[in-house]
């Protein structure tokens, strides 16, 4: 399991910080895990899965 910090999440998704946190508040994006104190990171595989779900939705009829 690999943990990634916010800059990597932003690079992977193309989202900005505020968009990531807005989606988390809506339960539409993986939540980070707390490391030490205020430091947090995301599970890379969960972020990849979220991206793959967005790609799959693109191909679904509306």
What are these regions (language model features)?
Residues 1-19, 23-24, 46, 52-56:
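Polyanion-binding surface elements
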Residues 33-39:
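Short Lys/Arg-enriched helix C-cap and helix-to-coil transition segments
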Residues 56-62:
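C-terminal secondary-structure termini that scaffold catalytic or DNA-interacting sites
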Residues 40-46:
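C-terminal end-helix/capping segment
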Residues 26-32:
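Short, solvent-exposed alpha-helical "recognition" segments
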Residues 2, 28, 38:
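Residue-level signal for beta-strand positions within conserved beta-sheet cores that form or flank
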């Amino acid at each position: 399991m690999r943990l990634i910090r916010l800059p990597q999440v932003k690079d992977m998704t193309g989202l900005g910080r505020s968009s990531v946190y807005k989606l988390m508040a809506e339960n539409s994006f993986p939540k980070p895990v707390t490391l030490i104190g205020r430091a947090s990171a995301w599970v890379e595989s969960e972020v990849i899965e979220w991206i793959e779900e967005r790609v799959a939705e693109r191909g679904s009829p509306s």
